[in-house]
């Protein structure tokens, strides 16, 4: 937000000139109610003790200095015990249009991240079956977060961790092998914990057609072959589903490569040398209690098998070795208990706490016409992400997944999200962009020419309260993006876009654009709409949602 950044810089200079230190608790906020200025600062309240002065007296002193320093300010009111309510000129707000025109698709970007290297790992579903709708929410959050952080000046790399070395993968191979035997008419028994979905039969049938001699193999070799084929087949499907959902992973990292490449053993040795790993009852343990965990954790069981945790430690060690300043893991909410031990691992690797963060994705309750759709991956009873995207479209699905805080449960009604009404959030926002484009097209058809370059004087007719409200809202875009990046919260963007769309729809309903009585206001209002369209398009792009020009 240009206004907030400008006010902050001015206040910091004033405090410095006073020979005082900038207080950590100083804030600049946008008042929720009208009549309290454009911005409110508490600087006099939190600086009074250090200055040895009454807060209101100090506020008066700061206000006088601020008036002399910033010509864009038209009023400073001292409220209550010493709050500074600051109002900026209409010319100042109208410059938002010029900045949007100049920046275009870069409007709202910043250098908040200062090039900090960040890795975002998301989805990382076991390649044991198609992605379901819960994976879709994690995919939308991860992909959008990466877009937002790049726009805010971070150097972001995205990654999918392929869990190809655990028990579930062995079960996958065994399930396909047994299904292949079944298709050949051989008697089989499929235990309860095996994968039973029709896709398992399809994979078995496909492999048998490609390799007629499959069943000539013994059980061990047959299971290995079925595992390799099934994993690659499912992984190819996952990649295609994500591409159709506009989700990109720059790196696909294999867990098996860590085990077979010796990285896990290397990590064990490192922990042992640091006195953080110990043998007990034939198993290898990690002293996670030294880092605040509620109990120590097993790395290698007494039978020699590795726990998931052991690979995860080696994986995160690998991440930091690649030079990332911040590692962000996006996990399902059922993994919340895993966070303390992973933080312990990061600390044991010698990394600072702020170098690791986790975004939790709560469950998606899939509904159809208000009725819950039952889902179970192993039983093969689930709605795939591909089916949902095919039915609702990627735009509606992504926006809906990003419409709420990621760690809050989400009801996703397949019928509701397809409605082309203002009750559908994605339609509401996309229609606002389409409405802007429609007005601009009609203006061109009527021969109304928009100047290639506008200036402040030509925008002077924009002076109404609703126009100033829109301009203040557009000025908040950069701050909203930066805040979403810092908080790892993509839903901040969707909420902001709903607010912008609402303001645009209200403005359009109240104010004539092309049929305005005063001719000198038509072009400025078109310029305002064009700036709104710029923000909507840029914001939707950060969510991976299209900005249609007509609907």
From Swiss-Prot:
It is found in: Cytoplasm. It catalyses: tRNA(Arg) + L-arginine + ATP = L-arginyl-tRNA(Arg) + AMP + diphosphate. Keywords: Aminoacyl-tRNA synthetase, ATP-binding, Cytoplasm, Ligase, Nucleotide-binding, Protein biosynthesis. Coiled coil: none annotated. Disulfide bonds: none annotated. Pfam families: Arg_tRNA_synt_N, DALR_1, tRNA-synt_1d. GO terms for biological process: arginyl-tRNA aminoacylation. One of its GO terms (cellular component) is cytoplasm. SUPFAM superfamilies: Anticodon-binding domain of a subclass of class I aminoacyl-tRNA synthetases, Arginyl-tRNA synthetase (ArgRS), N-terminal 'additional' domain, Nucleotidylyl transferase. GO terms for molecular function: arginine-tRNA ligase activity; ATP binding. Monomer. Belongs to the class-I aminoacyl-tRNA synthetase family. This is Arginine--tRNA ligase. It comes from Nitratidesulfovibrio vulgaris (strain DP4) (Desulfovibrio vulgaris). The gene is argS.
């Amino acid at each position: 937000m240009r206004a907030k950044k400008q006010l902050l810089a001015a206040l910091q200079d004033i405090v410095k000139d006073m020979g005082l230190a900038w207080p950590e608790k100083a804030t600049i906020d946008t008042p929720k109610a009208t009549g309290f200025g454009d911005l409110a600062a508490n600087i006099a309240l939190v600086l009074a003790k250090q200055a040895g002065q009454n807060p209101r007296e100090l506020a008066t002193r700061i206000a006088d200095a601020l008036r002399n320093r910033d010509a864009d300010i038209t009023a400073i009111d001292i409220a209550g015990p010493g709050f500074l309510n600051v109002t900026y000129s209409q010319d100042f707000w109208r410059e938002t249009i010029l900045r949007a025109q100049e920046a275009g698709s870069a409007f709202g970007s910043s250098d908040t991240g200062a090039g900090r290297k960040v890795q975002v790992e998301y989805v990382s579903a076991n390649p044991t079956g198609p992605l379901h709708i819960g994976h879709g929410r994690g995919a939308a959050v991860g992909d959008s977060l990466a877009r937002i952080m790049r726009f805010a000046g971070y150097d972001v790399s995205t990654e999918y961790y392929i869990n190809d070395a655990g028990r579930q993968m062995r079960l996958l191979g065994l399930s396909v092998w047994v299904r292949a035997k079944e298709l050949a008419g051989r008697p089989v028994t499929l235990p309860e914990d095996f994968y039973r979905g029709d896709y398992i039969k399809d994979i078995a049938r496909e492999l048998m057609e490609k390799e007629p001699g499959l069943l000539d193999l013994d059980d061990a070799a047959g299971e290995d072959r079925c595992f390799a084929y099934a994993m690659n087949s499912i992984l190819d499907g996952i990649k295609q589903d994500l591409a159709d959902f506009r989700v990109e992973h720059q790196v696909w990292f294999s867990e098996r490569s860590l085990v077979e490449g010796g990285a896990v053993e290397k990590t064990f040795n490192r922990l042992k040398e640091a006195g953080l790993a110990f043998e007990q009852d034939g198993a290898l343990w990690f002293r996670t209690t030294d880092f605040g965990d509620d109990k120590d954790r097993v790395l290698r069981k007494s039978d020699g098998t590795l726990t998931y945790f052991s690979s995860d430690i080696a994986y995160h060690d690998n991440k930091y070795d690649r030079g990332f300043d911040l590692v962000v893991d996006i996990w399902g909410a059922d993994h919340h208990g895993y966070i303390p031990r992973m933080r312990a691992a990061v600390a044991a690797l010698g990394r600072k706490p702020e170098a690791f963060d986790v975004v939790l994705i709560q469950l998606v309750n899939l509904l159809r016409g208000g009725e819950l759709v039952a889902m179970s991956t192993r039983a093969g009873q689930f709605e795939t992400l591909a089916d949902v995207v095919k039915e609702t479209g990627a735009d509606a699905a992504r926006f809906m997944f990003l419409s709420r805080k990621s760690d809050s449960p989400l009801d996703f009604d397949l019928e509701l999200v397809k409605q082309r009404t203002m009750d559908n959030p994605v339609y509401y926002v996309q229609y606002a962009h389409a409405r802007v484009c429609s007005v601009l097209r009609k203006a061109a058809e009527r021969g109304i020419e928009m100047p290639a370059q506008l200036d402040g004087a030509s925008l002077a007719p924009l002076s109404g309260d609703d126009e100033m409200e829109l301009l203040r809202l557009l000025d908040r875009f950069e701050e909203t993006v930066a805040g979403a990046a810092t908080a790892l919260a993509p839903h901040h963007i969707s909420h902001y876009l709903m607010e912008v769309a609402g303001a645009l729809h209200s403005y359009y309903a109240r104010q004539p654009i092309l049929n305005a009585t005063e001719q000198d206001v038509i072009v400025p209002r078109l310029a305002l709409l064009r700036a709104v369209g710029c923000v909507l398009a840029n914001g939707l792009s950060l969510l991976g949602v299209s900005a249609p020009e007509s609907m």
